[in-house]
UniProtKB/Swiss-Prot annotation:
Gene of this entry: paa-7
The UniProt record lists the keyword ATP-binding: yes
GO molecular function annotations of the record: ATP binding; ATP hydrolysis activity; polynucleotide 5'-hydroxyl-kinase activity
Bias-annotated ranges (Low complexity): 130-148
Organism: Neurospora crassa (strain ATCC 24698 / 74-OR23-1A / CBS 708.71 / DSM 1257 / FGSC 987)
Protein name: mRNA cleavage and polyadenylation factor clp1
Family: Belongs to the Clp1 family. Clp1 subfamily.
Keywords for the protein's UniProt record, in alphabetical order: ATP-binding, mRNA processing, Nucleotide-binding, Nucleus
Pfam family, one: CLP1_P
Protein function: Required for endonucleolytic cleavage during polyadenylation-dependent pre-mRNA 3'-end formation.
Amino acids binding ATP: E28, K78, G171, V172, G173, K174, T175, S176
One of the GO biological process terms: mRNA 3'-end processing
Subcellular localization: Nucleus
Length: 491
C-alpha cells in the first residue's frame, strides 16, 4: 500500500559524535562520564566513550596508551589523559553519554605534572641506591658461589627503597598521585608495594577495606578506578591486563574516625605484613612503598597524629603533602626531629594539587560504591561474571559484628543471629575458622564477600550471592556498618 508523500521524506543524516583533539606538550584532556542511568544499557555496543591515540604519546595516571588502539572509558569515570610530547586523540561518543570534557594546556614549567614526574625521578635515585646496597649485602647465589660463600651468607639487613606516604586535604588527588607513581615505577621495571589506609576507597577490593598489593605489571587504563578497582583482581576467566593479588583487611566503616582504635590496629598489622614482604622479596624491598591515606587538613591534630602513627608503622622516609602549604609546614615541624629505623631523616615534601583535581560528592561516591559491588559479583564490560545464588540454614553460617558504638573494653566482635535486617548487606568472608577467637577473626585477611539476598525467618534459611560455588565451610562472616545496602543485586 502506497502512502502519498512518504517517499519524499529525506532520510535523516546520522549524527556524528566523533571528533579529534590535538594536545600540545604537557596538555591534558580532562573528562567526566556520569554513572550509568537506566536509559543506557550495559549490553549496548556503545558501552562508553572510546578514545584512540592517533599520533604522539598519551597516558592515564602514568600508564601509556598504545597507538591506534581503541580504549573504552566507562560511565562513572572522572580522569584525564596527559601528554608530555603532544598527541592527537580521536574521541567517539556514539552512546550519547552526557560527556563533560575540556582541554587544559599549561606551559611545562607551570604544570603540576612536572613536579610529580620530578618526584618520580627523585624516588628512582633512592631506589637505585637501595639496589646497590642490596647487591653488595645480598649477592646472588651465582656470585656467592664465585666468592666461595654459602647461599646463606650476606644476610645483613639492607636499607629498602623509598617509603612514601601521600597525604593532604580532601579532593587534592592523593590516589591519582599514588597511581601515577606506581605506574611510572612499573614502567621502569620496578615492583613497588602500594598500601591504602583510606577505607572510603578500597584498593583492588570493595570500599570499607584497608589493603596492600605489589604492582609490578601493567595497570588497566579503561576501568573507572584506573587500575585500583576490583576488576584488576583474579577472576574465573581471561583478563585484559595482568591481575594483582591484594592483601585485604575488613574495616567495615566509611571513615577512619568511625573506629580509630581499630584503624590503628589494622594499620599496624598491615605494616607488619609489608615488612615481611620486604624481607621475602628483594625486588619489592628495593622498589619501596607507596601509602595512600585518608584526607587530613591543616590544624587537624587528631588526623595528623594518625598520620604520624602510619609514618612510624610503615617506617616512611618521605611524606608528600598535596595541596596545602600549611599542612606541609605543620608536618615538617612534627617530623623534624624524627628518624626512621635506618636513621634516615623523614623528608616532608609539598606539592601543588592539579587544578583538575576535584572533591567527589556524596552522590557520586555512593554510585561508585554500588558499581564496585556489582562489578565484584557480575564483572565489568570486558569480563562478564556469573555469581552463584546459594541457600543455607541459619546453623550453617556464623556471623560476627562489631559493636555499633565502640567503647572502652568492648569486644572487637560479637556473634549475632541472622535476621531479616541483614538483607542486601555485603558480608566479608574471613580467612579464619569459626573456632578462632574474635580477635583472631577480626584481624584475619579477607577471603572474599557475599551479599545476603533474602532471609526466611520462618524456615530459618538464608539466600546469598557468592562469586564461587560451594559451601562456606567453617569460614566466619563479618557484618560491618559500611558499605550500606544500597541496592538489591538480584532485582
Amino acid at each position: 500500500m502506497s502512502i502519498p508523500g512518504l517517499g519524499q521524506i529525506a532520510p535523516q543524516a546520522p549524527t556524528t559524535t566523533q571528533r579529534t583533539i590535538n594536545l600540545r606538550p604537557f596538555g591534558e584532556w580532562r573528562f567526566s562520564i556520569p554513572h550509568q542511568h537506566s536509559t543506557f544499557s550495559s549490553n549496548s555496543s556503545a558501552a562508553g566513550v572510546t578514545v584512540r591515540l592517533v599520533a604522539g604519546t598519551a597516558e592515564r595516571d602514568g600508564t601509556e596508551l598504545a597507538p591506534n588502539c581503541v580504549y573504552t572509558f566507562l560511565p562513572g569515570t572522572k580522569s584525564k589523559l596527559f601528554t608530555d610530547q603532544g598527541c592527537t586523540l580521536e574521541i567517539n561518543n556514539t552512546g550519547g553519554y552526557p560527556l563533560e570534557d575540556r582541554v587544559v594546556e599549561h606551559p611545562p614549567e607551570q604544570s603540576p605534572m612536572l613536579s610529580y614526574i620530578n618526584l618520580h625521578f627523585g624516588l628512582q635515585d633512592h631506589e637505585r641506591a637501595a639496589a646497590a646496597q642490596a647487591q653488595q649485602q645480598h649477592p646472588t647465589h651465582h656470585q656467592q658461589q664465585q666468592q666461595g660463600r654459602g647461599a646463606g651468607a650476606g644476610v645483613a639487613r639492607s636499607k629498602p627503597g623509598p617509603r612514601v606516604l601521600i597525604c593532604g586535604p580532601p579532593g587534592v588527588g592523593k590516589t591519582s598521585l599514588a597511581k601515577l607513581l606506581a605506574a611510572l615505577a612499573t614502567r621502569m621495571g620496578s615492583q613497588p608495594l602500594v598500601a591504602n589506609l583510606n577505607p572510603t576507597d578500597g584498593l583492588l577490593c570493595l570500599p570499607g577495606t584497608l589493603g596492600a598489593a605489589v604492582f609490578g605489571t601493567l595497570m588497566d587504563v579503561e576501568e573507572p578506578a584506573g587500575g585500583f578497582g576490583v576488576t584488576n583482581t583474579p577472576i574465573s576467566g581471561p583478563s585484559a591486563v595482568p591481575v594483582k593479588n591484594p592483601l585485604t583487611f575488613y574495616f567495615g566503616h566509611e571513615k577512619v574516625e568511625d573506629d580509630v582504635d581499630m584503624w590503628r590496629q589494622m594499620t599496624e598489622r598491615l605494616a607488619v605484613l609489608a615488612r615481611r614482604k620486604f624481607e621475602r622479596n628483594r625486588d619489592v624491598r628495593v622498589a619501596g612503598l607507596l601509602v595512600d591515606t585518608a584526607p587530613v587538613e591543616a590544624g587537624d591534630k587528631e588526623g595528623q597524629e594518625l598520620l604520624g602513627w602510619a609514618v612510624r608503622q610503615f617506617d616512611a622516609n618521605f611524606v608528600v603533602v598535596l595541596g596545602s602549604e600549611q599542612l606541609k609546614t605543620e608536618l615538617g615541624q612534627r617530623f623534624a626531629s624524627e628518624k626512621t629505623s635506618f636513621e634516615e631523616p623523614i623528608t616532608v615534601l609539598g606539592l601543588d594539587k592539579s587544578d583538575g583535581a576535584v572533591q567527589i560528592d556524596k552522590a557520586w561516591r555512593q554510585k561508585s560504591t554500588e558499581t564496585a559491588i556489582k562489578e565484584y559479583f557480575f564483572g565489568g564490560i570486558k569480563a562478564r561474571l556469573s555469581p552463584f545464588t546459594q541457600s543455607a540454614s541459619f546453623d550453617e553460617l556464623v556471623v560476627f559484628k562489631a559493636p555499633d558504638e565502640p567503647y572502652e573494653g568492648a569486644p572487637v566482635l560479637e556473634r549475632v543471629e541472622i535476621t531479616p535486617e541483614m538483607a542486601h548487606w555485603t558480608l566479608a568472608v574471613m580467612i579464619a575458622s569459626v573456632t578462632d577467637s574474635p580477635q583472631a577473626i577480626r584481624f584475619s585477611s579477607v577471603l572474599g564477600f557475599i551479599v545476603i539476598a533474602d532471609v526466611d525467618q520462618e524456615r530459618r534459611r538464608v539466600k546469598f550471592l557468592s562469586p564461587v560455588s560451594g559451601r562456606l565451610g567453617n569460614h566466619p562472616l563479618i557484618w560491618g556498618r559500611w558499605p550500606e545496602p544500597y541496592l538489591n543485586l538480584l532485582a
